[in-house]
């Protein structure tokens, strides 16, 4: 049974500057939560690993899309997938920390994040969707871990400052 609800979070974490109150919209299915929306002030946001005792396991499609004031995001180890266009048009995003349990980055997951200079794709990611980092014009280098087997079309297209991409031999499918 799916249900939707809003959760008001106070994100005054020691490791990150206080960002005030951030509102996350979630859905629940089989005892796990998917983040489906964000309506907070931006700045630095640390996505919680659990809310009210339920694990947060997925960032849904367009959940943080067009959050132009978002500058830093920490994705916990509880997250297993990042949905399509989850962070698209987060034009002020300068840092993203992706948890080690993420297995897939959806199509357009971080496209148009013009201020993002670097991204560490953790070991465990199997699939990088098409246009995942499309037009991330500040991105300078990317190392693909050996766990990745598939890279979608245009995953790094129009990353105009990208000077180095390291792709391991285990990648069996690259769509151009």
Report residues per predicted region.
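Consensus positions within tandem repeat domains that build extended binding/scaffold surfaces
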Residues: 61-63, 83-88, 106-112, 129-134, ...
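Sec-dependent, cleavable N-terminal signal peptides
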Residues: 1-23
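Structural signature of tandem-repeat unit edges
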Residues: 28-30, 41-58, 68-81, 91-104, ...
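Acidic, Ser/Thr
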Residues: 37-38, 50, 63-64
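Short beta-strand/loop segment at the start of cytosolic alpha/beta domains
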Residues: 21-37
């Amino acid at each position: 049974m799916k249900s939707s609800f809003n959760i008001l979070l106070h994100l005054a974490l020691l490791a990150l500057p206080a960002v005030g109150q951030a509102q996350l919209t979630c859905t629940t299915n089989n005892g796990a939560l998917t983040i489906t929306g964000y309506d907070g002030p931006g700045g630095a946001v640390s996505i919680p690993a659990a809310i009210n005792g339920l694990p947060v396991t997925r960032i849904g499609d367009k959940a943080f899309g067009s959050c132009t004031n978002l500058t830093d995001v920490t994705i916990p180890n509880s997250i297993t997938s990042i949905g399509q266009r989850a962070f698209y048009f987060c034009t002020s995003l300068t840092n993203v920390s992706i948890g080690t349990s993420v297995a897939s980055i959806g199509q357009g997951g971080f496209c148009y994040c013009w201020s993002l200079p670097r991204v560490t794709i953790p070991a465990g990611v199997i699939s990088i969707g098409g246009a995942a980092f499309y037009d991330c014009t500040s991105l300078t280098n990317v190392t693909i871990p050996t766990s990745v087997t598939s890279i979608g079309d245009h995953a790094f297209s129009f990353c105009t400052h990208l000077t180095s991409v390291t792709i391991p031999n285990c990648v069996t499918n690259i769509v151009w």
